[in-house]
A protein has these predicted regions:
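Amphipathic alpha-helical binding modules
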Residues: 75-108
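Extended amphipathic alpha-helical scaffold segments
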Residues: 22-30, 65-75
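Short terminal alpha-helical segments
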Residues: 2-49, 95-107
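Extended, amphipathic alpha-helices with heptad-repeat/coiled-coil or helix-bundle character
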Residues: 47-58, 68-78
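Short, charged, amphipathic alpha-helical segments
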Residues: 43-50, 65-70, 85-89
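Low-complexity, intrinsically disordered regions enriched in charged/polar residues
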Residues: 12, 16-19, 23, 58, ...
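Charged, low-complexity interaction regions
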Residues: 31-42, 57-65, 79-85, 107
Length: 108
């Protein structure tokens, strides 16, 4: 008996775009935190941002959402530079959009 191995299908264009945008927003946030050290909690925020960008989180968006909540809580308690706050808002908006697309079946 010959068994054929199944292959996963390639993500749709929308899925690639929204996930790429989300990854880019996390990279922006990480860069802003790293370039503006010194505010209260910056090292913890950087650590958890790296965690959110890990393969485990990318493959489990609910885990990424939990990590975003943690990062947001750390940053909102501190007097962060404007660039950090703007990148945090972008990550939050794209996370919401990505989770909505996941819930509606637009991405898996």
């Amino acid at each position: 008996m010959v068994r054929h191995m199944g292959f996963d299908t390639e993500p749709t264009g929308y899925e690639k775009t929204i996930l790429s945008d989300l990854q880019g927003a996390w990279q922006c946030l990480r860069r802003e935190i790293a370039e503006n050290p010194g505010f209260d909690g910056w090292e913890r925020a950087l650590l958890h941002t790296d965690e959110a960008m890990s393969w485990e989180s990318v493959r489990n968006l609910r885990q990424m959402q939990r990590t975003l909540l943690l990062v947001r809580n750390i940053l909102q308690r501190a007097d962060v530079p404007q660039g950090v706050a703007e990148c945090l808002e972008e990550v939050s908006a794209l996370m919401d959009e990505t989770l909505a697309a996941l819930a509606s079946g637009e991405i898996d």
